[in-house]
Amino acid sequence: MAINLKRALLLSVSSATLAALLPITAISNADTLPSFKPIARGALSNDSIYFVMTDRFENGNTNNDDAGIPGGVEVNGLDKKDIGYFHGGDFSGLTSRLSYIRDLGFTSIWITPPVVQNWIQIGSAAYHGYWGIDFTTVDPHLGTESEFKAMVSRAHELGLKVIVDIVANHTGDIIKNSYGMYNYVSLDMAPYKDSRGRVFELDKFIGKQNFPKLDVKKSFPRPPVVSKVNKNIKKPAFLNDLTNYHNRGDSTFSGESSIYGDFFGLDDLFTEKPEVVKGMIKLWSSWITKFDIDGYRIDTAKHVNPEFWNAFIPKIMETARKAGKKDFGIFGEVYDANPYMLSTFVQEQSFPSVLDFGFQRHGLAFAKTDGQVPRLIDLFNQDDLYTTATQSAYGMPTFLGNHDMGRVGSFIHSATYGDEELTLRRSMLANDVLFFSRGAPVLYYGDEKGMVGDSGDKAARQDMFPTEVVEWQEEYRIGSSPIGLRSSFDVINPLQIQITQINELIARNPALRKGTQQLRKTSRSAIAFSRYLDGQEFLVILNSSEDSDTLDIPVTTDSSWEQIYGGNAKFSVAGKMVSITVPAISTVVLKAKSTFTAKDKISVNLAKIDYDFSTPNWLALRATVPGDEFVQVNFQARVKGSGKWGNVGTSDRRTFETDEVKGGLHRVFLTPRKFKSGTTIEVIAIARNENNEIAYSKVREFKITY
């Protein structure tokens, strides 16, 4: 029996019944009902990540502290008393502490770039790993390739993934120019020229094999030069070709210079050239096959042209799959807190995920002071922006501080005006926000030890092993005393105990890590949300106020509840309503004592398709399902008249009502440029409840124009 989808009313049947009623052979290609696709949570959705700066973590071999090159700090970059130079941490030391990370409850480690560095530049050393010059092997300050492989092997034995920080935007600062001037020169002022001195439009040749041949003396505003000693210092060899760099001067971090300018003087790669694209794919594919690593964090992603990522990332993922890495995690550093900006890297630039700078801003704001709940609501309502057929916000690495901006403890200590007790309480609340909210939480090493630092960058990169930096010996620590000459590994901190307990709780209750997150109820300073997976509902309530707060919270599971985390909280249950008083600056987690089964008849309505005011370049696909039971709504689209449906993405939770957002919506967003302008598309919504019952919406049409 053929079904005309345009006239189809809502179907509500189980998957098995649907298969029986609609045999494939009886349906024409144009009218085939698509199969439901569940939400894709992403490779990192079940992970918690411990971020290590290798040089500052543990010194396992003092023989490599100077990289085997004697001669002092200006030669080898070693100065253990200066926060801007190498201190001696290495792979051997990290290997010896992997069990410590495992025992904290983490599932992955992320390490700073391990490649060979341009050791000294601009009055500092490359201990951090972001000034690479030989990307084919490891820096001798950190150890040998065999020691790196041993670290990865030991991590795998302990059940830890190894995520490596990589850079595709730039290399260390080796290239100068014949004028000795480094202010940015715009394309309008001096466009690129080919090797014969003819101007060409860069946009017309990005990534294409007919990219014009360039000449060092004729193609750039200021001819690049390099010293004889550094002529072949970089590896792979294509990095020594001076025409493989933009050579336009220092970025102003605005306009075109954000892509084409040198990042603080670092040599900016000409990632529009196919030679560079091919070289980078080969380079970073080799690290997967050679060292057996499990993921990449990609530095300075926003400063590289989108075409590069759309070529690079699929090839890297292909290499990982061939190497048996089905869950190879990739996330980009896009230093921007706006979800509309961040999500473009997922929707339009092939990134599986990005670091959640929006969470960093709003999660931190919630933890360090009261009255910030609306910002968290807006953040979580925007999670739909990241939903695709293969990814969602559940796989985004979340964090509250890092090696660049500074430690979360520094932000909180400043906000509490140095009140030590309040700083500890709010730091514990910050951990609750980080670990119980959706996403893959990232803890910056030392945060569990109460490290603070008086600012970002160098000041936030303390030694975990006994430090020779006097100011770090004397520095205030949350929940503890100054470290002095001791190793941080020898001091137990209340934050460390708390984090271990949270990770243990989540390991026993995986819904708290990878389950659906549904906002339930808020007040000025408290927020409550359900975490749900496989019939089990949990309720997380966080209160940032210095006073207790009482909430009446609707839930889906008609059950009695038990408290599994937090201080003394009074709560009562009446049907599907939990009334609870949460103590000041604290968190409570409740667990339903019985599992949930669907009772409502399922149906789904697909709203009119249109551009959303908040995302003028994307189509908003919105659907509603009556009631408040846990359902997933899958959206699929196809070119009108074709038989093949394509999965757009799946929503597993409803929007929360605000002044700007209508509540109760299941949403995903479609990027129109995946279709040719003038194309009419058809869209259908498919809902599935906990009983695996399926409902189909009517099909809606939309004509793509741009």
Specify the residue positions occupied by each region the protein language model found.
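Carbohydrate-interacting/catalytic domains
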Residues: 2-51, 66-69, 87, 92-95, ...
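Active-site-proximal helices and loops of the catalytic beta/alpha 8
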Residues: 33, 170, 179, 186, ...
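Substrate-binding/active-site clefts of carbohydrate-active enzymes
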Residues: 41-47, 55-286, 290-291, 312-321, ...
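Structural recognition of the beta-strand scaffold that forms the well-ordered cores
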Residues: 48-53, 108-113, 134-136, 161-165, ...
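Short, flexible loop/turn elements at secondary-structure junctions
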Residues: 53-56, 115, 139-142, 168-170, ...
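Short, solvent-exposed loop/turn elements at domain surfaces
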Residues: 57-66, 406-409, 472-474
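Active-site clefts of carbohydrate-active enzymes
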Residues: 392-420
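Long, low-complexity serine/threonine/glycine- and acidic-rich segments characteristic of extracellular
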Residues: 608-706
